């Protein structure tokens, strides 16, 4: 993403900022399932786990990553649901995915919810006690989006009350030590890992080079974010 770029200042100085959407989407989607299999098999602690076949997976935000998650989920035989405030329901359903009316419905209906929303003023800390609390028994929350979308104190409170819930992420929370107390129900990679594959890095580098060349060749700003 471009969360670390001061978009407003760049615009003020007439600096063009672009991103390379979709270049790491498969890498992130594959990691979602790496985390998910780890969680449903009880973090390989020797105890019997569960299977993904027939489980309901909810995807919050149906962009490049969300669509790849849906593609992989179908291979596991999962029922896939999605909600995206900016993607029409008929577009979602045209890909063989059930579209729901709102994020509350997504959390209520699904066994597992995978987050793919950006960190915006509207989404920051929106994944909170009330929302996650709607999940079914033995629900699993996966975050490969941004840590800012999680209301950490409220999720900690909920996990303390509901010992059936699991939370896995590739973004180390600020309250990692507190989450770690939920042994067997929480896992975080040491650093952001979703896009860290050789293929994703190559794809992003090539895409960036092409965009820079296009900008200087004919002023193309197709992927401008400011």
Model-based region annotation:
Residues 1-3, 22-25, 86, 106, ...:
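Short, acidic/turn-prone active-site loops that include or flank metal/cofactor-
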Residues 1-50, 175:
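Phosphate/diphosphate ligand-binding glycine-rich loop within oxidoreductases
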Residues 16-18, 81, 140-142, 166-168, ...:
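Structural detector of well-ordered beta-strand residues that form the stable sheet scaffold
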Residues 29-45, 74-78, 206-220:
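Oxidoreductase and adenylate-handling cofactor-binding alpha/beta cores
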Residues 39-75:
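Glycine-rich NAD(P)-binding loop of Rossmann-like domains
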Residues 87-181:
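Rossmann-like adenosine-cofactor binding region
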Residues 175-185, 193-226:
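NAD(P)-dependent dehydrogenase/reductase Rossmann-like domain
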